[in-house]
Amino acid sequence: MRGSTAMLLAAIALFSSQSFATAIGKSRTLRSFEELEERQLASGSGSNNGLDDVKRSALVELLGEKVVAGGPTSILKAMMKLSDEELQNFIDKNIGSDSDSASGGN
């Protein structure tokens, strides 16, 4: 039983570390927020992840120009340092505002 559990945990750890390494590798190749947007538009995947719903100016207001200019990795690191309340306020204020206004929420 212990052997099976250890094998399962090892498999999960290996899968997680490979996925994490792949994500880090991809984010290191991005140099700016604009480059991320260009890649998303070129691949047609921009509408799949919610980043299109957030204006760059909103990120600059929340995190600062220097962080946003640092690209996706620095944006994610900075957002991970925010409190749950700050993140929720940002989400409520900026994400999905188009659907809110269409339904009369704004």
From Swiss-Prot:
CC per GO annotation: extracellular region; host cell
The protein, known as: Secreted RxLR effector protein 18
Domain observations: The RxLR-dEER motif acts to carry the protein into the host cell cytoplasm through binding to cell surface phosphatidylinositol-3-phosphate.
Short sequence motif RxLR-dEER: positions: 28-39
Keyword Coiled coil carried by entry: no
Species in which this protein is naturally found: Plasmopara viticola
Principal localisation: secreted
Highest taxon above the source species: Eukaryota
Keyword ATP-binding part of the UniProt annotation: no
Family named by the database record: Belongs to the RxLR effector family.
UniProt function note: Effector that may act as a suppressor of cell death to interrupt plant immunity. I.
Induction: Expression is up-regulated at the earlier infection stages.
Keywords: Secreted, Signal, Virulence
Signal peptide: 1-17
Ranges annotated as spanning the membrane: none
Location within or outside the cell: Secreted; Host cell
